[in-house]
UniProtKB/Swiss-Prot annotation:
Its EC number is 5.1.3.20. It comes from the Bacteria. Catalyzes the interconversion between ADP-D-glycero-beta-D-manno-heptose and ADP-L-glycero-beta-D-manno-heptose via an epimerization at carbon 6 of the heptose. This is ADP-L-glycero-D-manno-heptose-6-epimerase. NADP(+) binds at residues 11-12, 32-33, 39, 54, 75-79, 92, 143, 169, 177.
């Protein structure tokens, strides 16, 4: 039976296609916008049955041209939190997603889509409740508004609708994202280019490099998506993080020590890395004051309550694995 992945040439989308392939699923239609042509690299080692541009796909799917479709993984969106064109953002992230969901409901197709932790904005609590949702930008609002529609539709929906509020995802196939790529990716490139990783100094009551995020490996993101794919009776909106915040220091130390290991050098403690100038702290930029979250940590109790019980990779495990993957491909 056919499976459709939108945003298939993107970061999470291409990892999902690869994850489906590893389970023997090759009847996968990839949907994307290859205006950024270099994204095609993410699909070179994937098996797909067809490729469609996002503009052609929506109407054809609504007409039922692809026959019985088991599931749509909707990862396609504008994920640039700095985008200021609100009309574009709402059309791309909200209206397109709404039309796609309606078609899935009409056809009895599982609909699994990407929401975002940006729906929480400045909140200090990251739980899937309306009272904690305070998006700070139009990207977060586009995701928030669609989640609100989903909540209205869930009681009457006859097929699965699942939204995943991704926290800070890192891992293979994100090179094309540029400045929006993960901290791990940027730390890796910075250290290889300059021999040091620079982190923010003290800010917001947090010591140098101690501002923390819920960093999750794309490997775990794929596993959770496929868990719900296997359980079409489960619907809802779920946080998708590890449930554990880790400081940027952990990312930097793991990146540097993994690269040192590749050169046959022993690992160093954070203090030693700082002492040797391999990790440096810079003054917190004035432009970010009052606009920067110093701490995020997903509440994954709802996800666990839905039956997902696998352990998530820590930064030390996942980032090290990712750095080795980057080394294999970049030499």
């Amino acid at each position: 039976m056919t499976i459709i992945v939108t945003g298939a040439a993107g970061f999470i989308g291409s990892n999902l296609v690869k994850g489906l392939n590893e389970r023997g699923e090759t009847n996968v239609i990839a949907v994307d916008n290859l205006t950024r042509a270099d994204k095609f690299h993410n699909l070179v080692d994937c098996e797909i049955s067809d490729y469609l541009d996002k503009q052609d796909f929506l109407a054809r799917f609504a007409r039922g041209e692809f026959g019985k479709v088991r599931a749509v993984f909707h990862e396609g969106a504008c994920s640039d939190t700095m985008e200021t064109d609100g009309r574009y953002m709402m059309e791309n992230n909200y209206r397109y997603t709404l039309s796609l969901m309606e078609s899935c409901l009409e056809q009895g197709t599982q609909f699994l889509y990407a929401s975002s932790a940006a729906t929480y904005g400045a909140s200090q609590v990251f739980r899937e409740d309306r009272e904690f949702e305070r998006p700070l930008n139009v990207y977060g609002y586009s995701k928030f508004l669609f989640d609100q529609i989903v909540r209205r539709r869930l009681p009457s929906a006859l097929s699965q609708i699942v939204g995943f509020r991704y926290f800070n995802v890192y891992g293979p196939r994100e090179t094309h994202k540029g400045r929006m790529a993960s901290v791990a990716f940027h730390n890796f490139n910075q250290f290889r280019a300059d021999g040091t990783v620079k982190l923010f100094g003290e800010y917001g009551g947090y010591g140098p490099g101690m501002q923390s995020r819920d960093f999750i490996s794309v490997e775990d993101v794929v596993k959770v998506n496929l868990f719900f794919f296997d359980h079409p009776e489960k619907s809802g909106i779920f946080n998708l993080g590890t449930g554990r915040a880790q400081p940027f220091n952990d990312i930097a130390a793991t990146v540097v020590n993994t690269l040192r290991e590749a050169e046959g050098k022993p690992p160093l403690s954070l203090d030693d890395l700082v002492q040797e100038g391999l990790v440096e702290y810079v003054k917190f930029p004035d432009a970010l004051r009052g606009k920067y979250q110093c701490f995020t940590q997903s509440d994954v109790s709802k996800l666990r309550g839905a039956g997902y019980s696998e352990r998530f990779l820590s930064v030390e495990e996942g980032v090290a694995r990712y750095c080795r993957w980057l080394l294999e491909r970049n030499g």
